Amino acid sequence: MAFRINHTHLKSPDPRKTAEWYVQAFGFTILGDETRVFGDRFIRCPSEDGGMDVNISGARTGETLGPGDASAHHGLEHFGFDSEHLETDIARLETLGARLLEGPIQSPTGSRIAFLKAPDDVRVELIEWRKSPWRAAAAEAGYRIVLNHDQ
């Protein structure tokens, strides 16, 4: 059996507020909002394209959470979203409270990236893919071509 990424899980002092930010910022949908037997509020949000669930929860009963860290660091460092226009998306996310950390950065292959600090000190990457006729044709046909992270 091939392994498939099932979800990403974010911890937040206010899970509903954080989930609503991702709804506005990236078109997530809130599918579940419950208090689990662990005592934490648990919200399930699939991404706009349905490719991955992002679970957002608070601390469990008796659990103390350390601070978030939006800086570059070891371990799970960020998650990325495709962008059709980097500057437009950066400006839109900043109006929602995100803060630009790095970029836009031009890669030698033509793609551009930027990193932002999202709620709860989560590091988010925006990726504006290189414009090319073959990539446009593939996208129109429903395919996404990625060459070595293409940045």
Q: What do these predicted ranges mean?
A:
Residues R4, G39, G75, G110:
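Exposed loop/turn and edge beta-strand positions of beta-sandwich/beta-sheet ligand-binding modules
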Residues G39-R41, T61-P67, E102, W134-A136:
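A short, acidic/glycine-rich surface segment
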Residues W21, E87-R92:
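Short amphipathic alpha-helices within nucleic acid-binding modules
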Residues G58-G62, E128-W129:
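Acetyl-CoA-dependent GNAT
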Residues A2, H9-V54:
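Core segments of cupin and vicinal oxygen chelate
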Residues I90-Q151:
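Vicinal oxygen chelate
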Residues M1-A19, L76-F81, R130-Q151:
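N-terminal beta-strand motif that seeds the catalytic metal site of vicinal oxygen chelate
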Residues G50-V54, T64, D121-V124:
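Short, charged/polar, Gly/Pro-enriched secondary-structure boundary elements
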